[in-house]
Amino acid sequence: MEKKRVYTFGNGQAEGKADMRNLLGGKGANLAEMNLIGVPVPPGFTITTEVCNEYFEKGKEAVVALLKDDVEKSIKGVEALMKSKFGDVENPLLVSVRSGARASMPGMMDTILNLGLNDEVVEGLARKTNNPRFAWDSYRRFVQMYGDVVLGMKPVNKEDIDPFEAIIEEVKKAKGVRLDNELDVDDLKTLVVRFKEAVKKQTGQEFPSCAYEQLWGAICAVFDSWMNERAILYRKMEGIPAEWGTAVNVQAMVFGNMGETSATGVCFSRDAATGEDLFNGEYLINAQGEDVVAGIRTPQQITKIGSQRWAELQGISEAERVAKYPSMEEAMPEIYKELDELQTKLENHYHDMQDMEFTVQEGKLWFLQTRNSKRTGAAMVRIAMEMLHQGMIDEKTALMRCEPNKLDELLHPVFDKEELSRARVLTRGLPASPGAACGRIVFFAEDAAEWHTNGHRVVLVRIETSPEDLAGMQAAEGILTARGGMTSHAAVVARGMGKCCVSGAGAINVDYKTRTVEIDGVVLKEGDYISINGTNGYVYAGEIPTQPAKLSGNFAELMELCDKYARLKVRTNADTPRNAQDARGFGAVGIGLCRTEHMFFDDEKIVAMREMILAKDVEGRKKALDKLLPYQKADFKEIFKTMDGLPVNVRLLDPPLHEFVPHDLKGQEEMAQAMGVTVDYIRQRVESLCEHNPMLGHRGCRLGNTYPEITEMQTRAILGAACELKKEGYDPHPEIMVPLIGILYEFEAQEKVIRETAAKLFKEEGVEIPFKVGTMIEVPRAALTADRIASHAEYFSFGTNDLTQMTFGYSRDDIASFLPVYLEKKILKVDPFQVLDQNGVGQLIEMAVAKGRSVRPELKCGICGEHGGEPMSVKFCHKVGLDYVSCSPFRVPIARLAAAQAAIEE
């Protein structure tokens, strides 16, 4: 039986439903579902995501042939429901053609409206509606969209504006008007003629007049847009597989531009920036939907309270607001009432915040789509917790509703209050996406990406953003636009990325050609600093320092919920008391990796460290180590104090010694003077330490076994600090970790030094501290012989950075030279240093845990590489039975949520 490729919907019936989003895409599944629950939706049909894959496998002609009969039959069904005919001159049916992947990708793919118009049909539409201006406005919009999306009419240079917009500006200038809606029917006819001439001149193609030719061109263009540059980039950012494909939705047009009783808009059942349980959105009277989301006109608010808040931000009086910018609630009260009832119905049906598009055609409300809304990290947490309290979802759903990586946004910095009080306010726009950002002004997306690569923080300043700006938005610290509302492309995408954004700052005048922006008489050029606050919409001159954000009660409640369900504990990687304090505040239950080498780089300590490394003999080394001991002990004491009552896993010295010595002549001269030796001696010693492959050389336990006096000093520092704190009434829990072992005897030799040193120290101090000695499993041989190692080691900590490096044979420092090619060619799906390789490295971990526990059933196992804060890797660690993961302090909340989700998914 031939598989079904086209699914129809309309008039309260549908062949699809909500749970078919993998096949129909999010939009197609929701259009079907809305029909089934009684929401007014224009009829249409969905071509499945599977066809998208067929399109790229078999080619355009083969797929058009496969679809032809089903599409033509479905069009006839829509004609019957709408009582009109596709391509008919007297009673025309017009359709929209939209993309719809299973995961929301706002603005990344293409849309075409008003399809089916030509020079004859437009006259019939004018007669049918008795509204020539509406008909010709619809036609010029169609030619503009089709020319862009299907025929490839783009600006030639990045400084140029859209070629169609350039023609519109010329016609408006000749007419002496400022706004598009001041153009009359003759002007619109002129635009259509000039648009078609421009298409022929730039593309060499005549604009198609046959309705079905237009339709097939649009369907294929939507499939093609799945592989456009911005869609590919967005998928990489969001982790969306290319094989998912996009569906194509063909739907009868309803018109928001048929006069003053028509409108179009976008609305949200809750606030997408803050999560406040407040219906909100924007609409435009006598407009089409793309006008709202494209940010071409700054729209009005749907609710009265939203309108009043907007007016306050813009400095508009209440009297002026009511007269010029009334809300839909005030201007169209009956439509507003129906819209409010239906948005509540949809949120209650989907049990999640909804992002909805609608059109009002001559007083009748139609819904064009609904989807689970994109939201900021702060909104995500608040909505999950409030829906839990409102009884809409249960605890597990609340946890699964939150994306671990988006928690990172809640930890975003805010402007320093003191510095802010002295800052100069330039203007205020709409607070489209919260956070604080400062950086150098750039005007073009490619420049933002280039400046970011060169180490500059940038703010992307645009008249309005488009999907082509995605790479620049990703590279920027924040985005500032002159046009567009809270539902414009810039706002929606910035919120999805967790980027700070101020939109619709009407007082700014952007000049792309001179690369300047003028704000209330102040001219700023490319490269000047600017600061923006996406939480309240303020724009400031210059660079304002930031400080850490304060976390909400909802965040704390979410974290408590995580701990209720998670089995896997979360520790932190911390080398300073400040790091440890941050991590403890985020809920870390210990330190999983304290790197001792980072403590040696202060001016005084590095001199003593270098003396130890460059010493001629054991006596010289011990003399230098005696200088280092009090420094190390003081450092450990502060960390143990901060983590009082919690385990602190200290890794003995790991890096190759050449990393600590001076390689420049000035540094070598200073070192020679400090040690009372010749510069030649220092240079020769430094050269003798250099290795061809230092990451596999004289480092880790190999240092401790070659120079046991180093291990002895570090053991005295760690346990000496613990003894002093014990006497002061603290409760330290030290763990000493031997790095880079591959052979049991390497561990045994180090353990012997540690235990003998501890016994002497405890006798001297008159106090004994319980402590553990464990090892880092980062050499594949250690994983393969884990049962033998566990006979001595009291715990395992998997160093997944080095374990990945040695398992793949990739140098972590050099992988950047070929990784982009490997990812592009799909040789690798992800960077294995970012996401744990479960099939190779993961198998070594799983094997080592099983072997280790076969000898020592109570063996504690964790990981301490950067993978410890990556959600997919955390879930793998849960699956293989690790006791904890350890990650950098600001990744602790992410790991806690991922651990809870892993337990729920089990």
Where are these regions (language model features)?
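Short beta->alpha connector loops at strand-helix junctions that form conserved
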Residues: 45, 482-484, 503-506, 594, ...
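Structural motif
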Residues: 249, 442, 459-461, 480, ...
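Nucleotide/phosphate-binding sheet-loop regions of phosphoryl- and nucleotidyl-transfer enzymes
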Residues: 1-423, 431, 450, 456-459, ...
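Short mixed-charge
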Residues: 76-88, 517-520, 759-768
